Amino acid sequence: LDRIVERMREMDYARAAAYEMPETEPDGFAEAYMHTPVGKIYAYSMAQFDHWTREPFSANFRRMLTLEQYRAPKLAQLHRDYLAGGPLEYMAAIFRRLTDTDDEAMQLALDFYGPMYLLYSVYDAAEEKETVAPMLAAHIRRFIARIETRYRWNGETDFEGGERFL
């Protein structure tokens, strides 16, 4: 299990680097996302979906964690970290830069990540799997449009032609 987790960690870092995403370890990652172009975040989000659904190693890891979370506390924690609470908290930290409250940031994280998480299962059950990624793409585009409409930066960091995500 430790080798599987290490391989997953390596794949995560490599994918984040390939899509030029801010590093996840430093305290300033949420601030760094504020300056990441929307196109990169969109592409990375779609790549994450492909990672968890189409890449055999990662998809099998996800399925294993989904099943085994109910049998083994260690696997339940891994499921939480990789697929449930971990991504949700990560996104809430990013959205906290836009909102007035932690609750509002968490709601935005749920609004963004909830459909993605659901679509993992939709993908698994779909006879025509190629129909699922376009649903996620449409969700992400609508979410971005909503964020860009409702939330504005203050001062020098106003949106510039829709090039920034948050």
Residue ranges with predicted function:
Residues 13, 17-20, 24, 53, ...:
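Short, flexible helix-adjacent loops and helix caps
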Residues 35, 39, 52-66, 70-100, ...:
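Amphipathic alpha-helical packing segments from all-alpha helical-bundle domains
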Residues 77-81, 85, 95-144, 154-166:
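Hydrophobic/aromatic-rich alpha-helical bundle segments in the mid-to-C-terminal region
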Residues 31-34, 47, 51, 55, ...:
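Flexible "cap/lid" subdomain of the alpha/beta-hydrolase fold that forms the substrate-access gate
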Residues 48, 62-66, 112-116:
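Short alpha-helical scaffolding segments that buttress acidic/His motifs in well-ordered protein cores
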Residues 1-34, 38-39, 46:
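An amphipathic alpha-helix adjacent to DNA-recognition modules
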Residues 45-46, 76:
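Short alpha-helical transmembrane interface motifs in multi-pass membrane proteins
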Residues 4, 8-16, 91, 95, ...:
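Hydrophobic recognition helices of helix-based DNA-binding modules
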